[in-house]
């Protein structure tokens, strides 16, 4: 089936039923869509890697949005800075994405209890945008109440899904603990046994949320950890099958009964676990790249010509030569972006996402 039969919008930011169809297609064809964290010019490097070939998720976190806007010197009370910058990023991505010939899911990441005002503000923007364009500004949002009780997590997530549902907007929720540290939630010291979500929680989430809307996914704990693994983390994607098998009789459903799963912690995982996760359950895999992939590129333009960088007038041997080109931050940043783009390609290969758009786009 070609993408003309699958998606109503062929390129650019997709929403609603197109997001649902894309994730369904990923499940049926055993690939996961890489979700790439972007901050600024990293948006272009992610799109560059996927150009004409692969669907992609572009997402920003509260921390990244605040970082991009904190230079304004204004208070972030009520998440005003993080909210306004995330909204600005959404408009920027919407303007750029169609040029790359691929479907793009526009997403915001995490959002703990203390950051809910950020989500509230973005939903306000979604509703305003929807009145004008009959679709939300963002394709999807995430709510991460994994630090709270399971009951409050599910109850609050359901409330937000009810708000998003009329816009056919996707909501990703986290249940259980993802190790490491991300966006102000620190689970670096938790016991490994705490990194696995219980089947009964998944079942309760599915029953509760599916009664409201089909536009949701679950970021469950399968031993995954944010950041670079140290070799002592055991990913257990087969737990997904145990979740489904335990409740298959109650649901009596021939299709995947427990919805769509998201794999967090893809940045530091080796290729084999990431590929295994994809083949077992994930329709989306989150990869936080800008922290890891920028450095090799930018540092190569600092370490190698370090003598030139000591003075804009050149090294002592060539006193009258202008070496200002070595100081151009655009050159350094571009080298970092090239490395990031290559890392995005690795993630697409790991998640079996490479050339999926070409498979979907036969023209």
UniProtKB/Swiss-Prot annotation:
* Class of the enzyme per the UniProt entry, highest EC level: lyase
* Triggers of expression: Only detected in the mycelia phase, but not in yeast cells.
EC number in record: 4.1.2.13
Q: Which residues bind dihydroxyacetone phosphate?
A: 227, 265-267
Q: Say which family it is in.
A: Belongs to the class II fructose-bisphosphate aldolase family.
Extract the NCBIfam families matched here: cbbA (TIGR00167), FruBisAldo_II_A (TIGR01520), PRK09197.1 (NF006628)
Give the protein's function.
Catalyzes the aldol condensation of dihydroxyacetone phosphate (DHAP or glycerone-phosphate) with glyceraldehyde 3-phosphate (G3P) to form fructose 1,6-bisphosphate (FBP) in gluconeogenesis and the reverse reaction in glycolysis.
* Name under which the protein is recorded: Fructose-bisphosphate aldolase 2
Query: From which lineage does this chain's organism come?
Result: Eukaryota, Fungi, Dikarya, Ascomycota, Pezizomycotina
């Amino acid at each position: 089936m070609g993408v003309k039969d699958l998606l109503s919008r062929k390129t650019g930011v997709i929403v609603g039923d197109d997001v649902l169809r894309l994730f369904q297609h990923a499940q049926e064809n055993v690939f996961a869509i890489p979700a790439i964290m972007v901050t600024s010019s990293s948006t272009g490097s992610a799109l560059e890697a996927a150009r004409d070939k692969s669907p992609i998720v572009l997402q920003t976190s509260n921390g990244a949005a605040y970082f991009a806007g904190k230079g304004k010197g204004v208070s972030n009370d009520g998440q005003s800075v993080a909210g306004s910058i995330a909204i600005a990023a959404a408009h920027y991505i919407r303007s750029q994405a169609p040029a790359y010939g691929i479907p793009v899911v526009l997403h915001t990441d995490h959002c703990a209890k203390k950051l809910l005002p950020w989500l509230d503000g973005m939903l306000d923007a979604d509703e305003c945008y929807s009145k004008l364009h009959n679709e939300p500004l963002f394709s999807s949002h995430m709510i991460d109440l994994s630090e709270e009780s399971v009951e409050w997590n599910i109850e609050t997530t359901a409330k937000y899904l009810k708000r998003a549902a009329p816009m056919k907007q996707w909501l990703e929720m986290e249940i259980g603990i993802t190790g490491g540290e991300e966006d102000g939630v620190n689970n670096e010291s938790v016991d490994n046994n705490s990194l696995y979500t219980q089947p009964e929680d998944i079942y309760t989430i599915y029953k509760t949320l599916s009664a409201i809307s089909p536009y949701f996914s679950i970021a469950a704990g399968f031993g995954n950890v944010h950041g670079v693994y140290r070799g002592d983390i055991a990913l257990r994607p087969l737990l997904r099958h145990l979740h489904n098998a335990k409740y298959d009789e109650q649901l009596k459903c021939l299709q995947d009964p427990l919805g769509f799963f998201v794999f967090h912690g893809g940045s530091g995982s080796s290729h084999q676990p990431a590929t295994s996760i994809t083949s077992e359950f994930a329709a989306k895999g989150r990869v936080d790249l800008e922290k890891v992939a920028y450095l090799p590129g930018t540092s190569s333009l600092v370490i190698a010509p370090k003598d030139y960088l000591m003075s804009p007038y050149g090294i002592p041997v060539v006193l009258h030569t202008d070496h200002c080109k070595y100081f151009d931050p655009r050159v350094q940043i571009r080298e970092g972006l090239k490395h990031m783009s290559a890392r995005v390609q690795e993630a697409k290969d790991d998640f079996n996402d490479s050339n999926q758009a070409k498979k979907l786009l036969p023209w």
